[in-house]
Amino acid sequence: MGECPFGHTRIETANPFYDAKQAIHLALTAIMFWLGGILVLPGSTFSTSHSYRAMELIARESIWALAFLAVATVGAIGLFVTGPIRKISVIGLATAHGTFSVCLFLGNPSGTGSGTYGIIACLGYYLLYRRLFRI
């Protein structure tokens, strides 16, 4: 009586994040690939925006691009495997988004990017919580 045609209970289907774990993981990975890709393109992203000032003080643009693409690659692998690799990939994705958010905030506290990527990082840590406790 409490099941839907797909075998889920009503409580499960009422939870908007019930089946969204893979979608969240995919979105975190895609955004990280996009960030790494933008930094790889010719031209200097760091020199065109003050928001990237803090990142430029830490490392060159190519280093950030390599780091973001490496994290995104591990994230993509985590989409297809289970176990510790999946959890490690989510830790990497969430932490990279969080680091990016903090750097944007330090470079331009009044910008909107820091809040946006901060929310994305929180979504990543929420996914990690779900993956760790199999919720």
At which residue positions do the language-model features occur?
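Membrane-water interface at the C-terminal end of transmembrane alpha helices
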Residues: C122-I135
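Cytosolic juxtamembrane helix and N-cap/initiation of the first transmembrane helix
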Residues: M1-W34
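Alpha-helical transmembrane segments of multipass membrane proteins
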Residues: G36, T73-I77, S101-V102
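Canonical alpha-helical transmembrane segments
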Residues: F68-T82
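Membrane-interfacial loop-to-transmembrane-helix junctions in polytopic alpha-helical membrane proteins
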Residues: R10-A23, Y52-E56, R60-I63, G78-I88
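Alpha-helical transmembrane segments of polytopic membrane proteins
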Residues: A59-F68, G113-A121
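Membrane-helix boundary connector in multi-pass membrane proteins
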Residues: T82-Y117, L132-I135
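Hydrophobic transmembrane helix segments
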Residues: K21-L66
